[in-house]
Amino acid sequence: MKNIAEFKGAEKLASKLLEIFSNLSGNGKSFDPMIEGVHQVVVIKAEERLSAKGKEMKEIKVRSTNDGRDATFYIMKFRKQDWKTWEKIEVGQQLTITLKYNNGFPNVTINQKGEVIDNLPEKPNKPLTNQTIYIYDIEVFKKDNLYVFRDYFTKEWTVIHNDLDALRKFYLANRDSLFIGYNSHSYDSNVMRAHMQGKNPYHVSKAIIDSDDRGLVYKMFDTKKTPLFGMDLYQDNRGFSLKEHSAFLGINIKETEVDFDMDRELINWREVMKEHNLSEEMDELTLTDELARVTGINVDIVYKLVMGNALVDEKTLNEIYCKNDVLATELRFEQNIGMLVAKATIALYFGLDKTALSMTNANLTAELLGAVKQEERGDELDKYELPEGFDIESDEIKKAFMSGEFEQNEKGNASIALEVNRRDVTEVLGVGGIHGAKESFIYVGDFNARDVGSLYPNTMTLFNYESRNIPEDKKHVFQMLLDERMKAKYSDKETINVRGVEIPTKLLINGFKLPLNTTYGAMGAAFNKLYDPRMRLLVCITGQMALFDLLEKIEPYATIIQSNTDAHYYIPFSDEDAKKIDELAKDWEKRTGYTLDNDPFKAIFQKDVNNYLAVTADGKVKFKGAIGLTNGLKVSKAVVSNAFINYVVAGKDYKDFINECDELRQFQIISKTGWTFDDTVVRDVDGNEHKAQKVNRVFAIKDPSNAVEIFKVKRGSIMEEEGTTIVGDDSYTKGVPNAPEYYLIDNDTIGEGTITLDKLDKDYYINQVEDLLVMWFGTNWKERIENAHSQMEEFPEVKNYID
């Protein structure tokens, strides 16, 4: 594991992303509003619907055949003359129109009608400006603003500080580029676009930060102007802040010393002092008075800066901080590049335009499937009917799921929680699917996993459980995605041509998987166009009924190890029983319509249904749960996970693994103070406290003289939480769970700070592994694991499974 994460092949994939992006329809100019005048257009949307006030209307959208610009307007039915003019206008109608604007609203007159065509014009994708990928970030103060852009390929920086003209020139020279940010769709993009339109960036920034009303933000500038093509790395990866990702990746996570709430322009105090012959050697009060006089800043504010040794170059510090965030975003971009290419690929496959890339995966999926938002149907709790062909024997299951309407839980959704005690495991059925497992279980020998292929997507198509918000003429799309994914999966081609772009087959498969795996969740999201809680419930229940049906058929011939949403792991009693299960599985496939994979394994070490290590027949290691650190994303105490995995499945002594490890990033422990707390403080060995940042990188150390302790503070509140002490009226909660006895903070880039390998307390990390072993396998863990190792003919490779 490198001190700073590296992602080989990222630049090649970024080039492919840019190629796909450039082939999506649209350029910056084509998304500008259609200008007043006479235009040759084609109608690309003609939809009758109700207005927000319930009035009958028709939404018309036309596209210029010259430059691809669009105009959208609404014809109200009660305006009889207008309605008569537009009532029979349909999609594909060619028109010559005159466009005028009245208070910003388009007024369209038809000059001439042409033929109706089938092939609607796409927006031109030829770039009219420089086209590249920019990584960017912005910092906005009340009287200061900073924009930092970095060309991903040339690594050239563009820094724009308090210069609106320069920002507009940069935009006009690069508007056909792809802009990558972190939380940029909600924040950076809106602030930048509003600023270019002459709005106050600070006011827009505050509205975004302080208000939950998105509509308020969009009223502050014209969302139809200054289009910015972008992808937001935060959008579909909620849960971790950019600072946390920076910490996991090993780079500098120091927060800026500049106060974002300051009510003045940023100042280079060193320059001011030099210009006016002032020195920090002067008497503090005299220096304060002089600086206040020459800058015009309130004397109390200046005094705090003088006393706090904060007379720094604020502009440079802010630029350094912003550049550091851009570099962090760039590294996260490289880490996530595969998903971004998959997203762009599916947009290209469906012929969407460049703005589709700024959508969340859920909204993009709704767009692909043509979903139209509907009123709630109120049928979620209706009685469930088991599909034909299913064979459930359990009366307990029938009573819980098929006897009548469902009860409503506290969130207003159907309550479907049930525990069923079986011979080997207790099966838990609920909104998360079927789950059950033998706890603290170790087995060495041949066993199988029967895994249902694409359980939820196939449930939707087999039983017509797709969202009812998908129009009839789009119902085939979901099945087509399933079919095309399977076709690509079994293709022997390295690349497949999609609209003139050669896409690596693996990336195309991931592109198809994106909407397939997103649809189920979107059907339960109230603000998504696919929202259909009844169909989502039917998918959830039917998937569990299918798995329970299969469970009942396997049980007489095998020991069940675990059930996990779409699979059963089991040990056949004999070779004959294994053959019998194969026969029953084929019958199950025929009855239900699903397909089953049969994956062979040769060892499993299982804490519970959500935490296990398994060795496949070909010696690969499959792991699930916290030990995997969010699939290697959350690099915190990685050496503990790696030592644990290598000891349990590969027989490598965990003490030796840790003592031999010379990779500092494996030893980092990342702590974060959540939003429910007011402050983070650090206490040194002498009991002195000072304010600390929310995200910190700490290491266990041997020397107590350098140790500190982090606390999360709730002001004026008494909290009853483990690890919490009361200090006056405040609650102090330990900021590092399972903390070392002694630790220090080092928020510099790993390898450039104060921590070195010789300072580490490696015994702490060894003890953490032993705590995990007890948690998984009990106090006799050593005997159990050594017994398992004695039965293993060969071990998997010793390596960093978290890397």
Give each language-model segment a name.
Residues 35-52, 133:
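Structural detector for short beta-strands of small beta-barrel domains
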Residues 51-78:
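OB-fold (S1/OB) nucleic-acid-binding surfaces
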Residues 80-98:
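Short nucleic-acid-contacting surface segments enriched for D/E, G, S/T with interspersed K/R
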Residues 100-121:
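OB-fold/S1-family single-stranded nucleic acid-binding modules
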Residues 125-126, 139, 247-257, 262-458, ...:
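Conserved "right-hand" nucleotidyltransferase catalytic core of DNA-directed polymerases
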Residues 149-244, 259-261, 289-294:
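Conserved DEDDh/DEDDy metal-dependent 3′-5′ exonuclease domain
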Residues 180-182, 189-190, 391-529, 791-794:
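Catalytic nucleotidyl-transfer cores of nucleotide-processing enzymes
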Residues 509, 578-803:
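C-terminal, non-catalytic extensions of nucleic-acid polymerases
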